[in-house]
Amino acid sequence: MEIPHIPVLRNEVVDIFKDLQGLLIDCTLGFAGHSSAILSANENIRIFACDKDDEALDFSKKRVEIFKNRIKIFKSGFSNFLPFLETNEILNLSNVVGILADIGVSSLQIDNNDRGFSLKSDALDMRMDKNASLDAKFVVNHYSRSDLERIFYEFAELTNAKQIAAKIANYRADKEITSAKELATIIGTSNFKNRSISTATLAFQAIRIEVNKELDELNKLLDSIENSAIQNAKIAIITFHSLEDKIVKNRFKKWAQSCICPPFFERCECGNNHAIGKILTKKPITASADELKQNSRAKSAKLRVFEIKR
C-alpha cells in the first residue's frame, strides 16, 4: 500500500523503545508510521494507540493489520486518552512501559486541499478533528481584531501581529474570507524579517494552534501522565514549535526536581523526594542530515525523552 506520510525521527523513536517489554501508548497514531516501525523492530511490545482523525484511523487499521494481535486502536484525542483508558478500565496504567506523542500535523493533512492547512488550499478549515465545531473560517471571520492580534503574537511570535490582524479585519468588513489562499494573499507571503519562513506560514500556524487548542491539549496530556498510575515508563514527545518544546522541556524539568521548596528557603523542608524520574535527553534530539534530505518538514522536529521511575 502507498504510504502517505513520512514519520519524523522514526529510527530515533524505535531506538528509544527497542529494549522494552510490555505495553506502549501511542497517543498520536496518525498514519501509524511510528507504531508500525516499533512493532516491526520489537516483538515484545504491544501498543494501544489513538487518533481523532477518521481518515488517519481508516488508513492505519489497514497498515497494521499484520500486527492486529499486538495493537488496539481507539478514536480519541491525545489529551484525554490516558483518562479514557483508566476510567473505562480498559487497562491498568501501571503496566505501561512507554508513551509516545508526535505533536504535529501530518504531511497528508497539510497537502490535502480540502483540509485547509496549506497556503494554497481552496478550503479554510484546519481542524484535525473534522467533527470539532471551531474551524479556521470562523476564527478568521468572527474573532475580534484584538483576539486575532493575540493569537498571532502568542502562537507565532509575530511582532507585526497588530498589522496582520488589521489587514484581516479591514478585508472581511467588505467580504467574507472563504479560502486559505485568499487569506494568504491578504496577509502577504513575503518572509518574516530575517527568517526563512513566510509571514503567512507563521500566521497560519497560529490559527491552526487556536483552532485545535494545541497548547492546551499538550498541557492536558502532560497533566494526565503526571497524575497517572504509571510506575516505570519512557515518555517520548516530538514537537514542531518552540512554544510546544518549551512546555515539554519545563514539565520534564519539574518532574526531575526532587526539592520543591521556594528558592529563598535556606534549607530543604519538603523532604527532597518529589522527583518522579529523570530526563534522558539533556538537549532535544533533532533530524539527521540524511533525514532532512528525504523530508525537509522534519527540520523543526524536536524529540525529548523522560524516564518515569516512581
Curated annotation (Swiss-Prot):
Q: What is its EC number?
A: 2.1.1.199
> Superkingdom of the source?
Bacteria
Q: Which keywords does this chain's UniProt record carry?
A: Cytoplasm, Methyltransferase, rRNA processing, S-adenosyl-L-methionine, Transferase
Query: Single Gene Ontology BP term?
Result: rRNA base methylation
The subcellular location is:
Cytoplasm
Summarize the protein's role: Specifically methylates the N4 position of cytidine in position 1402 (C1402) of 16S rRNA.
Q: What does the sequence similarity comment in the record state about its family? A: Belongs to the methyltransferase superfamily. RsmH family.
Q: What is this protein called?
A: Ribosomal RNA small subunit methyltransferase H
Question: Coding gene?
Answer: rsmH
